[in-house]
């Protein structure tokens, strides 16, 4: 059954809605309203009556069965013991998809697993889908849908985020806002009683608003199916996975956290590799890669050019490129074009060192030439902040030149410096140009793009 109703519901019921700040039923109502959801919202609470949130008055229905119209999605926020009955009513009502926020099921052990299985059977009886239980909700920015108790102001963009951990997922939403990473969707999967990562991958594969997918997982329900689906999706869009529970202690923690069987870590690594999935080991690394993979075009060749104003960061970037197996373009005849943008003591050998005297004009000319050259396939622009050029001015130059070139090549930026450098990085990221405060991070993100692109080329025809 399609997941269309999960991401584009025409109406949403919040079962366990509340007008009391601090309650999850209040936070979900507030987020739906504040994020601009345009469908109908129906609060449901056994107490009935009327509630007012953000100046909007709502009639409260005592049961989902009392709602006169069709309900596409019902978000359940009642204590675990009431969930089976509420879900039965959702089925009778013809609700299509039910995110169950409530916890106290499979993660508690055998008894909880039995109840969870009953929920799945109820859902199947009515042809209904369940997300969760034990989740924080779902966001889909193209539909202005924020049915979570996480941050309200999620930035729209091309990255879909799937998280098995609730608290971490909410924290990651906050991180993306701070780091200027735009999201198409955020989905909390929790115990994955029904809808799992593979189902979501199938949806995002054909979702035109999603260019890359990032998953935090502790384990998979059906390893074979996940790998088969991931392999198909990877031929079209990149998937980055943070797989936790790598150690024995970590695996035990995962089991008590979301009821996941973590499985052998080596098996996961091998399976990811086969399926074209990029495995990240830290949150920072995953988002660094996601920036590049969700915003940049695929490289049309192996030649990378590094443009810098400082020998130091140029050398560090070169080391990182060598470690990652990237090929630095070394045709000196062609690299000579950069001599026009540097003093006589500069170096046009790759890395191209414009020297500490580099101003806006130097960078503008060098970036323009690199973007226009048919044999230069990817570009890393590095800048050590000096008094000669305000980093924000450099950001404007990069944005302008990249846009005017038609964004046909991958381009990453690293700016090392103070507060102005941070502002410049934010400007670039807001404009879909991956920018970082360290050269190695920029190079590794570019490398992730190459790894996926090469895997895809190898498997495309098979």
Swiss-Prot record:
Q: What is its main location?
A: cytoplasm
- State what inhibits or activates this protein: Activity is dependent on magnesium.
Biophysicochemical property: pH dependence: Optimum pH is 9.0 (at 80 degrees Celsius). Optimum pH is 7.0 (at 55 degrees Celsius).
User: In the UniProt record, does the keyword Nucleotide-binding occur?
Assistant: yes
The cellular location(s) given in this protein's UniProt record come to:
Cytoplasm
Q: Which UniProt keywords apply?
A: ATP-binding, Cytoplasm, Ligase, Nucleotide-binding
One GO CC annotation, please? cytoplasm
Which reaction is catalysed here? acetate + ATP + CoA = acetyl-CoA + ADP + phosphate
List membrane-spanning regions: none
> Thermal dependence of activity in this record?
Optimum temperature is above 90 degrees Celsius.
Entry EC number(s): 6.2.1.13
Signal peptide feature range: none
Q: Which Pfam families match?
A: CoA_binding_2, Ligase_CoA_2, Succ_CoA_lig
Q: What GO molecular-function term can you cite, just one?
A: acetate-CoA ligase (ADP-forming) activity
User: What does this protein's UniProt record list under function?
Assistant: Catalyzes the reversible formation of acetate and ATP from acetyl-CoA by using ADP and phosphate. Can use other substrates such as isobutyryl-CoA, propionyl-CoA and butyryl-CoA, but not indoleacetyl-CoA, phenylacetyl-CoA or succinyl-CoA. Seems to be involved primarily in the conversion of acetyl-CoA to acetate. Participates in the degradation of branched-chain amino acids via branched-chain-acyl-CoA esters.
Q: Which PANTHER family match?
A: COA BINDING DOMAIN CONTAINING PROTEIN, PEPTIDYL-LYSINE N-ACETYLTRANSFERASE PATZ
Q: How does it assemble?
A: Heterotetramer of two alpha and two beta subunits.
Its family remark reads: Belongs to the acetate CoA ligase alpha subunit family.
Recorded protein name is Acetate--CoA ligase [ADP-forming] I subunit alpha
Q: Which organism is it from?
A: Pyrococcus furiosus (strain ATCC 43587 / DSM 3638 / JCM 8422 / Vc1)
């Amino acid at each position: 059954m399609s997941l269309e109703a999960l991401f584009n519901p025409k109406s949403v019921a919040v079962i366990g809605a509340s007008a009391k700040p601090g309650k999850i039923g209040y936070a979900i109502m507030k987020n739906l309203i504040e994020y601009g959801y345009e469908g109908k919202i129906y609060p449901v609470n056994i107490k009935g009556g009327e509630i007012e949130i953000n100046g909007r008055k709502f009639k409260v229905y005592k049961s989902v069965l009392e709602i006169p119209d069709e309900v596409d999605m019902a978000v359940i926020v009642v204590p675990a013991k009431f969930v089976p009955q509420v879900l039965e009513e959702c089925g009778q009502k013809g609700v299509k998809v039910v995110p169950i926020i409530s916890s106290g099921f499979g993660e508690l052990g055998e008894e909880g697993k039995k109840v969870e299985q009953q929920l799945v059977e109820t859902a199947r009886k009515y042809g209904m889908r369940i997300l969760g239980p034990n989740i924080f909700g779902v966001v889909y920015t193209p539909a202005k849908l924020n049915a979570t108790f996480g941050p309200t102001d999620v930035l729209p963009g091309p990255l879909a985020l799937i998280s098995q951990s609730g608290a971490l997922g909410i924290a990651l939403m906050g991180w993306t806002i701070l780091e200027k990473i735009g999201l198409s969707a955020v989905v909390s999967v929790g115990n994955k009683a029904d809808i799992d990562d593979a189902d979501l991958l199938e949806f995002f594969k054909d979702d035109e608003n999603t260019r890359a997918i990032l998953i935090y997982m502790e384990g998979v329900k059906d390893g074979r199916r996940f790998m088969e689906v991931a392999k198909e999706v990877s031929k079209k869009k990149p998937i980055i996975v943070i797989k936790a529970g790598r150690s024995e202690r970590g695996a035990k923690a995962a089991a008590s956290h979301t009821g996941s069987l973590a499985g052998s870590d080596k098996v996961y690594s091998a399976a990811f590799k086969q399926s074209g999935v990029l495995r990240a080991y830290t949150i920072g690394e995953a988002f660094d890669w996601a920036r590049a993979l969700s915003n940049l075009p695929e490289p049309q060749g192996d030649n990378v050019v590094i443009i810098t104003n400082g020998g130091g960061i140029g050398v560090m970037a070169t080391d990182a490129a060598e470690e990652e197996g990237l090929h630095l373009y070394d045709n000196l005849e062609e690299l000579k074009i950069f001599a026009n943008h540097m003093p006589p003591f500069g170096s046009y050998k790759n890395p191209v060192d414009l020297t500490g005297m580099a101003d806006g004009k130097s960078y503008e000319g060098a970036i323009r030439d690199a973007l226009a050259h048919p044999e230069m396939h990817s570009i890393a622009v590095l800048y050590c902040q000096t008094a000669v050029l305000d980093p924000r001015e450099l950001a404007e130059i990069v944005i302008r030149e990249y846009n005017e070139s038609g964004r046909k090549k991958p381009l990453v930026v690293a700016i090392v410096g103070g507060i102005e450098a941070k502002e410049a990085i934010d400007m670039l990221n807001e404009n879909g140009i991956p920018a970082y405060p360290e050269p190695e991070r920029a190079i590794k993100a570019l490398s992730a793009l190459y790894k996926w692109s090469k895997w895809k080329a190898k498997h495309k025809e098979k």
